A protein has these predicted regions:
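Alpha-helical subdomain
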Residues: 1-141
Length: 141
């Protein structure tokens, strides 16, 4: 496993931007759970969206690959609720992809950006998810 190649003695932070959309949910779950076991105290940060958004993003790719079941691909609506159930080692937090990091009350923010933010973060549940890997299982803490 590539895990053994990483010296995590000083901690480990992983970023997977725009990656998990192309994997099946069981594949993402297996990877996340294995990472939580291999890198206690580490972190994984990635972007996620709901099924509607994933379907739109993957529309061309799915058609070319002749894949019919977009529901099998990784998508998240409520990261804390859905992903916390994967492992006792996961501490899950998330913020809106656009609204979570920008103050839209600022007058310098254009109306079009506000509109995109509301569609992306609202209707499509686009979010940045942070998983903190516990040093021990919740049951033993």
């Amino acid at each position: 496993s590539w895990f053994r190649e990483i010296d995590a003695s000083g901690g480990a932070v992983f970023f997977a931007a725009g990656v998990f959309y192309y994997f099946l949910t069981p594949q993402v779950r297996a990877l996340v759970c294995a990472m939580a076991e291999a890198f206690p105290g580490g972190k994984l940060v990635f972007d996620a969206a709901n099924r509607k958004a994933v379907k739109l993003m993957l529309k061309t790719w799915l058609k070319d690959a002749e894949i019919k079941d977009v529901g099998a691909y990784f998508a998240v609506t409520d990261a804390r609720r859905e992903l916390s159930a994967w492992s006792d080692r996961l501490r899950v937090s998330s913020r809106g992809y656009m609204l979570g990091y920008n103050d839209l009350r600022n007058q310098n923010v254009r109306k079009f950006f506000r509109f995109l933010s509301k569609v992306g973060d609202g209707m499509m549940n686009m979010q940045i998810v942070r998983l903190d890997f516990a040093k021990e299982n919740k049951k033993h803490e």
